[in-house]
C-alpha cells in the first residue's frame, strides 16, 4: 500500500453510513471493498461484541480502538473495557474535553486518572485525542502538555494533525517532542480557510509526515474526515487511493 501496509479509518468519518447499516459499512470499507485494514470506533451502533468481532474478521479489519467521552467512561467503564477486550481492540481514547485554563486541566486529570489506571490494569491502553483548544498556553505551557504531564505514565497521545495545524503549531516538531507517547496519528487534511479537505487537496505533505512519523515509532495511521466534496464514502475511497499512491 505504498508507505503504509496498514491504514485505518475513524468511523465517525462515515457516521451517516454506519447509522443506516453498521455491518454493511464495514463490508464496504474492508478487504472486499476499499481495502482499509482497521477501524477506530466512535460508538458501536448497538451491535453486540460477538457480532462485531465476526464482522471485523470477515472483512479483514482490526479494531484499533474507540473514542469514548469522559462521562461515558465514568458511567460505563467496566462495560467499555469488556467490549474492547471482546473485539480485541487496543485503545480507549478520550476524544474531547473542555478546557480553557490550567485549573480546568488539573480537574480533568483528576477525573481521567482513575479511568486510565483501570483501563491499563485491564491490559488496554488509554489515550487522549486533541482538537485546537488544547494548544492554548497557560503559564507558558500548552494545556495539552499540562494534561499529559498530570496523567499516568503510559497514557497515549493520538495527535490529530489537522487540529495542531489549525492551532498554528509546528506539528512535526511537536510530534518529535512527544514521540515517546505518540502512538496514533489522525491523518486529516487542512486547506484554505482552515477547512477539512480531501487528503490530496490541502497543505499537509502526508508523504513527509508519514515517513517522519514512522521513524518516530508511530504505530497507527487513521483517516478522519469531517467534511466531504461528494459523500462520506467517496471521501473514504479517495483517501485510501491517495495513501496507496504515496
Language-model segments: what does each one mean?
Residues 8-20, 66-73, 98-104:
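Active-site mouth loops of central-metabolism enzymes
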Residues 1-32, 45, 50-51, 57, ...:
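Histidine-acidic metal/acid-base catalytic patches
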Residues 11, 41-43, 68, 96, ...:
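Short glycine-centered, acidic/aromatic-flanked micro-motifs in structured strand/loop junctions
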Residues 27, 35-38, 55, 70-156, ...:
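Active-site acidic/histidine proton-transfer and metal-coordination neighborhood
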Residues 8, 38-40, 65-67, 93, ...:
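Conserved beta-strand positions in the central sheet of alpha/beta enzyme cores
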Amino acid at each position: 500500500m505504498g508507505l503504509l501496509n496498514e491504514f485505518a479509518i475513524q468511523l465517525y468519518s462515515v457516521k451517516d453510513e454506519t447509522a443506516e447499516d453498521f455491518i454493511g459499512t464495514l463490508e464496504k470499507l474492508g478487504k472486499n471493498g476499499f481495502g482499509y485494514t482497521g477501524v477506530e470506533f466512535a460508538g458501536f451502533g448497538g451491535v453486540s461484541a460477538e457480532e462485531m468481532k465476526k464482522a471485523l474478521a470477515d472483512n479483514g479489519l482490526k479494531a484499533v480502538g474507540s473514542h469514548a467521552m469522559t462521562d461515558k467512561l465514568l458511567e460505563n467503564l467496566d462495560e467499555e473495557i469488556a467490549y474492547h477486550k471482546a473485539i480485541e481492540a487496543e485503545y480507549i481514547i478520550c476524544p474531547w474535553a473542555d478546557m480553557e485554563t490550567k485549573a480546568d486541566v488539573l480537574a480533568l486529570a483528576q477525573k481521567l486518572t482513575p479511568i486510565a489506571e483501570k483501563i491499563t490494569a485491564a491490559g488496554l491502553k488509554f489515550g487522549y485525542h486533541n482538537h485546537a483548544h488544547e494548544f492554548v498556553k497557560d503559564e507558558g505551557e500548552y494545556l495539552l502538555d499540562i494534561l499529559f504531564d498530570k496523567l499516568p505514565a503510559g497514557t497515549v497521545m493520538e495527535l490529530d494533525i489537522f487540529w495542531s495545524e489549525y492551532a498554528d503549531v509546528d506539528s512535526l516538531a511537536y510530534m518529535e517532542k512527544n514521540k515517546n507517547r505518540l502512538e496514533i496519528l489522525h491523518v486529516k487534511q487542512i486547506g484554505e480557510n482552515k477547512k477539512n479537505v480531501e487528503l490530496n487537496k490541502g497543505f499537509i505533505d502526508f508523504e513527509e509526515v508519514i515517513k517522519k512519523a514512522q521513524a518516530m515509532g508511530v504505530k497507527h495511521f487513521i483517516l478522519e474526515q469531517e467534511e466531504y466534496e461528494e459523500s462520506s464514502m467517496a471521501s473514504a475511497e479517495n483517501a485510501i487511493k491517495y495513501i496507496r499512491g504515496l
